[in-house]
């Protein structure tokens, strides 16, 4: 079971760990006690900037400052230790990570960032994608012979402009002086592992995320044929480690900055696509979870590699060596809710936050207050938002169609339409897209599923009304675990638990993460949601050319 508390006495039989959930807009750090259960003793959050478009100097750019990641990590580490004086820094057995994936962090031999890291959202490399794979006779956006080679070795294909290969090639083409300085290509958590331990490594799931990883049994590792095909210097790729492996120890310098003991073990951890499902308890074959954070996805645990190139879905390497995560992504999920806060209802939300919050509220508490506001507002509008339909493609889209030109829209606004309908339509639009991806997934994975229940997690699962809307739109049970916003950190703790042999396998995590609430679908809302869902899917098909005219 997962608990959250601050005060207490040290359990002499327990192990204490600190884990970091590094998201798109902030870090969530948790001090966790591992015993017969996993208990979150304290948590702390800190935000950092996401620089997009004009802020990067490039159309489609999405970058972050690595020093801001590290500063947030140091600040929150000290905070959780201060909240738990009965747990000293010497009692921390290890640290681990869960982070956003498919970033591009290029470092020199000293471990310094050569340029500001690009995030998974970056879509500047359109020309590199076209030259690299999107030319000639194509299937699912990839030249046929290259597609076949990809599928033979990696089980997936780099046919999205947001894939890190094309960002790497963009640096080669546009920043040759920076390219010459590259020692290693890292992802986000790998950079923080380097900063903490001095080790240049990458976990298997992150390596798969580069789409340069050979997944064939007995051949696991960097794939030389694919690297040659796309023009990647294999010497730029770091040593590959398991997610449950101790990859290094905290250095003297890092220990002083973090407030931890020198020599504390550093574990590999995993990407968010690998560990959020683990933290939600979706660890057995056939288990499905839906995540709604800044981005969002639908993931199902499967025993083999599966590819649906036409829908940009693939079974990715995770932290369990005996399973894969069949995965479809929405680029902007709860980011759409942030857009509501910042633009559509800025004044109303500001008044609400002043009334129910205060200036000292943490990054996380503001998120809680925001969902309280949304719950209060959308409850006043009937299912279907009085016919208004929203598309959550605020930064293009990846699954079940790849189109960086796709954009958000409100459809069917009339004279009587109010702001509250628009706000509810945003929440419904996110859920419609999740249903679209889930239905496409189940064309491939239905044979593995033991039940239709879906585990819902991330910040989006904080709102009871949002959870009920998802259940109604999917027309199936939706279950939520305790602290759904902290599950990435719990998944990272599971890596340490397995690495320290406190639990045998990742599948054993499920019994430690019981369901808190189950939402059952309201059959009365099925007809209106089915109607709006059909319109939702039509909106992309009917506007694809218009998106290209306006955004291409």
Task: Kindly give the residue locations of the regions a language model identified.
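Glycine-rich phosphate-binding loops at beta-strand->alpha-helix junctions
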Residues: 26, 242-250, 270, 294-296, ...
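Phosphate/ATP-binding catalytic cores across multiple sugar-kinase/actin-like superfamilies
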Residues: 75-83, 273, 422-452, 499, ...
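Acidic, glycine/GT-rich loop-and beta-edge segments that sit at the periphery of enzyme/chaperone cores
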Residues: 1, 336, 343-358, 500-552
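Activation-segment/catalytic-loop signature of the eukaryotic protein kinase fold
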Residues: 381-479
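Conserved ATP-utilizing enzyme core subdomain
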Residues: 28-30, 197-198, 202, 358-408
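N-terminal glycine/serine-rich phosphate-binding loop of ATP-dependent small-molecule kinases
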Residues: 2-116, 127, 255-256, 260-265, ...
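Glycine-rich phosphate-binding/hydrolytic loop that grips phosphoryl groups
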Residues: 130, 275-279, 328-334, 338-341, ...
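Glycine-rich phosphate-binding/catalytic subdomain of phosphoryl-transfer
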Residues: 55-60, 67, 74-365, 369
């Amino acid at each position: 079971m997962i608990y959250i508390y601050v005060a207490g006495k040290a359990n002499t039989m327990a192990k204490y760990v600190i884990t970091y959930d590094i998201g798109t807009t902030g870090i969530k750090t948790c001090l966790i006690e591992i015993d017969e259960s996993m208990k979150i003793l304290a948590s702390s959050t800190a935000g950092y900037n996401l620089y997009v478009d004009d802020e990067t100097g490039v159309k489609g750019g999405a970058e972050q400052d690595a020093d801001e990641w590290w500063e947030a990590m140091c600040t929150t580490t000290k905070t959780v230790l201060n909240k738990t004086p009965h747990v000293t820094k010497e009692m921390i057995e290890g640290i681990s990570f869960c982070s956003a994936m498919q970033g591009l962090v290029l470092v020199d031999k000293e471990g310094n960032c050569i340029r500001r890291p690009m995030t998974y959202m970056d879509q500047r490399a359109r020309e590199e994608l076209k030259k690299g794979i999107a030319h000639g006779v194509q299937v699912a956006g990839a030249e046929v012979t290259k597609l076949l080679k990809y599928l033979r070795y990696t089980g997936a294909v780099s046919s999205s402009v947001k894939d890190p290969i094309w960002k790497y090639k963009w640096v080669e083409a546009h920043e040759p002086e920076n390219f010459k300085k590259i020692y290693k290509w890292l992802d986000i958590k790998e950079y923080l592992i380097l900063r903490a331990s001095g080790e240049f490594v990458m976990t298997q799931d992150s390596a798969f995320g580069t789409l340069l990883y050979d997944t064939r049994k007995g051949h696991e590792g960097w794939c030389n044929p694919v690297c040659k095909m796309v023009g990647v210097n294999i010497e730029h790729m770091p040593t590959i480690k398991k997610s449950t492996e101790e990859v290094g120890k905290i250095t003297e310098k890092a220990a002083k900055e973090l407030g931890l003991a020198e020599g504390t073990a550093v574990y590999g951890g995993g990407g968010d696509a690998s560990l959020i499902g683990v933290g939600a308890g979706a660890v057995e074959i056939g288990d499905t979870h839906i995540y709604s954070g800044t981005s969002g996805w639908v993931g199902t645990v499967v025993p083999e590699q599966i590819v649906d190139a036409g829908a940009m879905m693939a079974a990715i390497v995770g932290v369990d060596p005996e399973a894969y995560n069949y995965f479809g992504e929405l680029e902007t999920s709860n980011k759409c809710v942030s857009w509501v806060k910042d633009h559509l209802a800025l004044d109303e939300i500001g008044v609400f936050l002043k009334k129910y919050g205060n200036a000292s509220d943490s990054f996380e508490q503001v998120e809680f207050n925001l969902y309280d506001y949304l719950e209060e507002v959308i409850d006043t509008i009937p299912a279907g938002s009085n016919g208004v339909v929203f598309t959550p493609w605020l930064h293009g889209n990846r699954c079940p169609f790849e189109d960086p030109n796709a954009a958000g829209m409100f459809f069917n606004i009339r004279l009587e339409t109010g702001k509250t309908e628009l706000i509810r339509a945003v929440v419904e639009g996110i859920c419609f897209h999740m249903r679209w991806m889930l239905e496409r997934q189940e064309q491939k994975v239905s044979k593995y599923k033991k039940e239709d229940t879906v585990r819902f997690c991330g910040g989006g699962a904080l709102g009871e009304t949002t959870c009920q809307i998802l259940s109604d739109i999917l027309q199936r049970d939706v279950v939520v675990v305790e602290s759904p916003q902290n599950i990435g950190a719990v998944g990272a703790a599971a890596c340490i638990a397995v690495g320290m042999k406190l639990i045998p396998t990742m599948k054993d995590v499920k019994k430690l993460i019981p369901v808190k609430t189950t939402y059952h679908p309201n059959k009365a809302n099925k007809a209106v949601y089915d109607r709006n869902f059909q319109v939702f899917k039509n909106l992309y098909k009917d506007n694809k050319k218009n998106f290209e005219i306006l955004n291409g």
